[in-house]
Design a protein with these regions (language model features):
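Short hinge/gating elements
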Residues: 34-41, 75-85, 116-119, 124-128, ...
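Glycine-rich phosphate-binding loop plus the immediately following alpha-helix
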Residues: 37, 138-164, 195-237
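Gly/Thr-rich phosphate-binding beta-strand-loop-beta motif of the actin/hexokinase/Hsp70
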Residues: 1-31, 50, 65-69, 168-199, ...
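Active-site neighborhood for divalent-cation/phosphate handling
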Residues: 69-168, 275
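Phosphate/pyrophosphate-binding loops at sites that engage ATP/ADP/AMP, CoA/4′-phosphopantetheine
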Residues: 52-65, 148, 220, 258-274
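Non-catalytic, solvent-exposed interaction/assembly segments
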Residues: 1-97, 139-141, 147-151
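Helical "lid/coupling" subdomains associated with nucleotide-phosphate turnover
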Residues: 49, 215, 224, 229-230, ...
């Protein structure tokens, strides 16, 4: 069972293995009240755990072992270069290497790494993805799912979890692909060269911006703004006015995404991105897909 806990909703999916491959058996989704989770930090675990319990019940999911992912500014992903060495030796020295790059006390984080291969510019070095997550945040998510009566078996990083889903469903080995996930409060960009991630960036922009603008103009609730955002008619705002609000916010998203892509092209001038894959709630907005 996969559990996706966002800042405005929680999703659950039960996957089974069949002779024809993996099959989606059950799926469910429920809203989370504003403020319960902000930038990945859980402020109201009791409410969120109860929502998860109800969601599992309504989706008729009885399996209690779950895989989940974490994100936000308590998670750091950094591509670094280190002296070429065996993986076992790097395992012993990674804390020392990480101290140069992690803006937290190294004793307060869980560390992991993935060796990407030889550094293209220095054959005596290798490129490594360094991942650090604050222990406090990891423990908060473990406590949350435990409160919901579940057992966390896998805790991944959101960007890597999305990459795994993509690679499991699409056989694209030689293309450069940009995975863009537009959530409620942040947009994540992950650029893949084949099966390797070479560039990641998060920007604090998301669908919540559109809702906030609509709420401010119409003095309405978040739920009403959500319906209007996806095209429900309103006597307080014309379709053209709504389209302009959405277009203005989406233009900001695209500006930040282009900046990130420009940074990628600066570092990889000979590479071209052949395909863009969109996910998250923002992918449902026609204005964004068109830009």
């Amino acid at each position: 069972v996969g559990l996706d806990i966002g800042s405005r909703s929680v999703k659950v999916a039960e996957i089974t293995e069949t002779k024809n491959g993996r099959k989606l058996k059950r799926f469910g989704m429920a809203d989370i009240p504003p403020g319960a989770i902000e930038d990945g930090a859980i402020s109201d675990p009791e409410t969120v755990s109860q929502i998860i319990r109800q969601l599992l019940k309504s989706a008729n999911i009885k399996e209690t072992n779950v895989a989940l992912s974490i994100g936000g500014y308590s998670v750091i992903i950094k591509k670094i270069n280190v002296q070429t060495m065996p993986e076992a030796q790097l395992q012993e020295t990674i804390h020392f290497e990480a101290e140069q790059y992690i803006p937290f006390d190294i004793s307060d984080v869980n560390l992991d790494f993935q060796i990407l291969g030889e550094n293209e510019n220095n054959p005596n070095q290798m490129s490594v993805f360094l991942v650090a997550a604050k222990k406090e945040m990891v423990n908060d998510y473990i406590n949350l799912v435990t409160l919901a009566g579940l057992t966390p078996c896998i805790i991944d990083v959101e960007a890597f979890a999305l990459q795994n889903i993509f690679e499991a469903n699409y056989d694209i080995q030689d293309e450069n692909v940009a995975l863009i996930d537009i959530g409620a409060s942040k947009t994540s960009l992950n650029i893949l060269k084949g099966s390797s991630s070479v560039f990641m960036r998060d920007v604090a922009l998301g669908c919540l911006q559109i809702n906030q603008k609509i709420m401010s103009l119409l003095d309405c609730s978040y739920e009403q703004a959500e319906l209007l955002k996806f095209g429900e008619a309103s006597d307080k705002m014309s379709a053209e006015e709504l389209k302009q609000i959405v277009a203005a916010v989406v233009t900001d998203w695209c500006t930040e995404i282009r900046r990130a892509l420009d940074f990628f092209y600066t570092n990889y001038p000979d590479d071209q991105i052949k395909r863009i894959i969109l996910s998250g709630g923002g992918a449902n907005l026609a204005e964004f897909r068109q830009l």
